[in-house]
C-alpha cells in the first residue's frame, strides 16, 4: 500500500502523507496542505477529523471500543481499579505494588481542600449547577497551588506528578463538597487510611464527625 494520498485541485496535484493508527486505520495528514495550496479543508463538527496523535486512548464510538494505553476498558473495569487505571493513563503502564502504594499516598496527601477553596464553594447558591461550581472550585484550587501552574514548561513538567495527583484527589473532594453544599451541610473530614472511593463515599454521605463503614459492594462497583 502506498504511504501517500494524491489530491488534485484544478490542475495542481498535492501529495499528502498517510498515517496508520494503532488499530490500522488510515488518516490523511493535511498539515502542509494550506501552506502549499492556500486551500483548507471543511469538516462540519470535526466528525471525520483526528485532532492529534495519541498513545493514551483509542475510541471508536460506532463499534463501542474504548482502550486506555491498549487495554480494553471492560478488562480494566473487571480487573483493575480507579487509581491503577489513572496511573496507567499518566505513565503508560500498570503500576507495580510499590508504585501503586506511592501513587496512592501522593493522591491521599491532597484529599483535604484548602480553606479558601471550601469558602469558594460555600459562596455558591445551593441550587447552582454542579459543573459550574466544580469549574469555579478548580479555578480556586489553582490559586491555592501556584507552584503547579507557573507557565514555565520545564517547571510545570517537573511538578507533573504532584499536580496530577492534586487534581485526581481534589476533584473527588470538590464533588463531595458541592453535594454537601447543595444540602446546606458541611463536608465530612477525609480519612487518609481509607481507599480513594471509600473516602469519596464517606465524604458524600457521612455527617461531620461520623465514620460510617462503606459497603464493600458499593465501593467495588464505584472503583
What are these regions (language model features)?
Residues 2-223:
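Hydrophobic alpha-helical bundle cores within soluble ligand-binding/oligomerization subdomains
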Amino acid at each position: 500500500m502506498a504511504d501517500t494520498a494524491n489530491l488534485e485541485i484544478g490542475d495542481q496535484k498535492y501529495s499528502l502523507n498517510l498515517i496508520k493508527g494503532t488499530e490500522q486505520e488510515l488518516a490523511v495528514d493535511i498539515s502542509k496542505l494550506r501552506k502549499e495550496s492556500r486551500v483548507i479543508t471543511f469538516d462540519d463538527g470535526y466528525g471525520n477529523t483526528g485532532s492529534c496523535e495519541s498513545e493514551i486512548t483509542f475510541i471508536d464510538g460506532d463499534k463501542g471500543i474504548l482502550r486506555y494505553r491498549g487495554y480494553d476498558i471492560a478488562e480494566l473495569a473487571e480487573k483493575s481499579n480507579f487509581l491503577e487505571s489513572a496511573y496507567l493513563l499518566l505513565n503508560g503502564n500498570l503500576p507495580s505494588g510499590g508504585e501503586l502504594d506511592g501513587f496512592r499516598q501522593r493522591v491521599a496527601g491532597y484529599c483535604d481542600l484548602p480553606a479558601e477553596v471550601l469558602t469558594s464553594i460555600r459562596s455558591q447558591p445551593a441550587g447552582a449547577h454542579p459543573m459550574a461550581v466544580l469549574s469555579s472550585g478548580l479555578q480556586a484550587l489553582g490559586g491555592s497551588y501556584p507552584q503547579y501552574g507557573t507557565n514555565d514548561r520545564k517547571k510545570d513538567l517537573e511538578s507533573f506528578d504532584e499536580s496530577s495527583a492534586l487534581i485526581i484527589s481534589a476533584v473527588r473532594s470538590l464533588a463531595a463538597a458541592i453535594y454537601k453544599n447543595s444540602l446546606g451541610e458541611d463536608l465530612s473530614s477525609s480519612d487518609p487510611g481509607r481507599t480513594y472511593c471509600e473516602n469519596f463515599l464517606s465524604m458524600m454521605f457521612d455527617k461531620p464527625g461520623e465514620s460510617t463503614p462503606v459497603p464493600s459492594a458499593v465501593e467495588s462497583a464505584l472503583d
